[in-house]
């Protein structure tokens, strides 16, 4: 070993001996950063968030959430929702839906209206059950990715709830019920379609129907709660 | 020299032990006692000073050192044990937490164990749903039962949704708990509870059936319940319900009874097993329909409406009677004693 090392040393000395008297002309830059230009892409910029203003951080997260909302509204075959999941959007949607469903009968105690906790539990428990079911059927999607998609796809139903409350403010007639029925049905179809578009690819093709049924049931229950919501007249 | 260094190590250990003790006392109070903390820090600084002095003394006079060292060792041994106890408790807590977390993780990782029971095609599920309504009149040869849980589980969840709908539309009020919890509890309770019970009875009656098959059989039997409840919660005719109860509920019950018959030997055993199954299944449908229906709504209203004058007021009238009765009783006892 020592011999070979010695040989290597002497060999390198011999190799670089010729370079010692090579002169480099002044116009060729020989100094610079020792970073590979390909590596310094967006990834590294994203990581260095220590010294950026708090506003930037919050705005970036908000933008990510808003971007996902857009994806739900225009359900294309995209993997943005799946790639970097977060649970902020689902939380906001779930809480706002539960608050809106709660609001109408907060003053009267004993009507069977949906309670905040009930809506909250239905959404999260249902999402977990759907996810476990898709895992059991052999789906190739991670737990939180599925939760994220299912949570974001409540967005149409939250919008439907908003519309329903506005309609209920105006009138309590049969016509208003028909309007609500149409809105909720459309938004229910939208939710199911959007979540299916994102999640169906992760399922084996022959079992897609089995994975879609619980999703359908889940959104059906929520949309039914939205439809039957009635402010105390 | 070696001795002195050993004792110094002991002393430092003592210091740590004492500190640990004090920390434990502080932690027990759940509020950080500032006085206590101050005491600790003060004493520890004093100790440090003492240690320094002692070390110097030990270096100066080598003979007195072993005695003192032994004493210290004995004294510090106690404190060291206490500190170690605390550390051990903390260690055990940590271990328990770790075990819990790993158990939860294992449960998630072991999801593969359950996967065979969910290995179905949509067409198979559809066929099994239809077959659950068609009784097969073949009792000489054991009928096949699919050991699968996807269909039953989805049927139970569907029934939860239908029950929720029924509760809402009938205006059912549940005092303690939510509608959701009641619906889930009822459906899963029936499915798991009755399956276990039937399995137990089947074991007693020597029927050839496994727990998985019982779960699957009863689960698919709920398909008829789902249809009947969904229709009759929306269309309120009692005659319609009774017809559906007998036809659809009866068909799904007959199917299960036929399967059980084909897997049991002996008339008494067959009668016991199938009678239990049929009674439970049909009565459950009856219960679900009438428990969350408009008929009961009326009863609930009378029970809840305390502002309505009626039998409820009797409670208020009864209340003053109780002390009277007690007074009468005590008066009589006193009289009897005085005699």
Swiss-Prot record, chain A:
The yes or no answer to whether the keyword Membrane is present is yes
Its transmembrane ranges are: 85-105, 112-132, 143-163, 181-201, 209-229
GO biological-process terms attached to the record: endoplasmic reticulum to Golgi vesicle-mediated transport
**Location, primary (coarse class):** Golgi
Q: Which gene encodes it?
A: yipf6
**Lineage of source species:** Eukaryota, Metazoa, Chordata, Craniata, Vertebrata
Q: Which GO cellular component terms, listed alphabetically, does the Swiss-Prot or TrEMBL entry include? A: Golgi medial cisterna; Golgi membrane; Golgi trans cisterna; trans-Golgi network
Q: What is the originating organism of this protein?
A: Xenopus tropicalis
Q: What is this protein called?
A: Protein YIPF6
Per the record, ranges on the Lumenal side are 106-111, 164-180, 230-233
InterPro entries hit by this protein: Yip1/4-like, Yip1_dom
Q: Where in the cell is it found?
A: Golgi apparatus membrane
Provide the alphabetized UniProt keywords. Answer: Golgi apparatus, Membrane, Transmembrane, Transmembrane helix
**Family, per entry:** Belongs to the YIP1 family.
Q: How does it sit in the membrane?
A: Multi-pass membrane protein
Query: Hey, which stretches end up on the Cytoplasmic side?
Result: 1-84, 133-142, 202-208
Which superkingdom is the protein from?
A: Eukaryota
């Amino acid at each position: 070993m020592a011999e070979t090392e010695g040989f290597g040393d002497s060999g390198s000395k011999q190799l670089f001996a010729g370079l010692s008297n090579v002169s480099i002309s002044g116009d060729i830059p020989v100094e610079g950063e020792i970073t590979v230009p390909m590596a310094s892409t967006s990834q590294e910029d994203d990581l260095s968030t220590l010294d950026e203003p708090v506003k930037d951080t919050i705005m970036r997260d908000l933008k990510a959430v808003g971007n996902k909302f857009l994806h739900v509204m225009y359900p294309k075959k995209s993997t943005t929702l799946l790639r970097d999941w977060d649970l902020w959007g689902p939380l906001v949607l779930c809480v706002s839906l539960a608050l809106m469903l709660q609001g109408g009968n907060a003053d009267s105690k004993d009507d069977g209206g949906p309670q905040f906790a009930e809506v909250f539990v239905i959404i999260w428990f249902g999402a977990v059950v759907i996810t476990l079911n898709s895992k059991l059927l052999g789906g190739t999607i991670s737990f939180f990715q599925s939760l994220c998609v299912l949570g974001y796809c409540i967005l149409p139903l939250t919008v439907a709830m908003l519309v329903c409350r506005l309609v209920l403010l105006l009138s309590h007639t049969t016509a208003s019920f028909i309007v609500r029925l149409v809105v909720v049905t459309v938004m229910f179809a939208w939710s199911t379609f959007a979540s299916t578009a994102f999640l169906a690819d992760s399922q084996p093709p022959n079992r897609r129907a089995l994975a879609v049924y619980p999703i359908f049931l889940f959104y059906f229950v929520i949309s039914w709660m939205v439809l039957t919501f009635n402010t105390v007249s | 020299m070696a001795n002195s260094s050993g004792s110094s190590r002991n002393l430092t250990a003592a210091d740590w032990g004492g500190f640990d003790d004090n920390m434990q006392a502080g932690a027990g109070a759940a509020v950080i006692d500032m006085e206590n903390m101050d005491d600790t820090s003060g004493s520890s600084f004093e100790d440090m000073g003492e240690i320094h002095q002692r070390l110097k003394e030990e270096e100066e006079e080598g003979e007195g050192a072993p005695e003192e060292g032994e004493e210290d060792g004995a004294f510090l041994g106690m404190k060291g044990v206490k500190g170690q106890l605390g550390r051990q408790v903390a260690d055990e807590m940590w271990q328990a937490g770790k075990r819990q977390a790993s158990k939860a993780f294992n449960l998630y990782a072991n999801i593969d164990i359950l996967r065979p029971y969910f290995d179905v095609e949509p067409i198979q599920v559809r066929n099994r749903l239809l077959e659950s309504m068609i009784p097969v009149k073949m009792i000489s040869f054991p009928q096949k039962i699919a050991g699968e849980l996807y269909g039953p589980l989805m049927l139970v969840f569907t029934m939860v949704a239908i029950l929720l709908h029924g509760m809402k539309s009938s205006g059912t009020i549940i005092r303690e708990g939510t509608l959701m919890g009641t619906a889930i509890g009822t459906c899963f309770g029936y499915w798991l509870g009755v399956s276990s019970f039937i399995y137990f009875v089947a074991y007693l009656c020597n029927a050839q059936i496994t727990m998985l098959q019982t779960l699957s059989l009863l689960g698919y039997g709920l398909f008829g319940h789902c249809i009947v409840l969904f229709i009759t919660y929306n269309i309120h005719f009692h005659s319609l319900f009774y017809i559906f109860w007998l036809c659809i509920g009866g068909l799904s019950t007959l199917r299960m009874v036929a399967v059980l018959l084909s897997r049991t030997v002996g008339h008494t055993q067959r009668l016991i097993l199938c009678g239990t199954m049929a009674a439970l299944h049909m009565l459950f449908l009856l219960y679900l329909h009438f428990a969350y229906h408009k008929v009961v709504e009326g009863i609930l209203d009378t029970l809840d409406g305390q502002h309505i004058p009626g039998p409820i007021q009797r409670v208020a009238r009864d209340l003053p009677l109780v002390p009277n009765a007690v007074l009468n009783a005590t008066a009589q006892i006193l009289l009897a004693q005085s005699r």
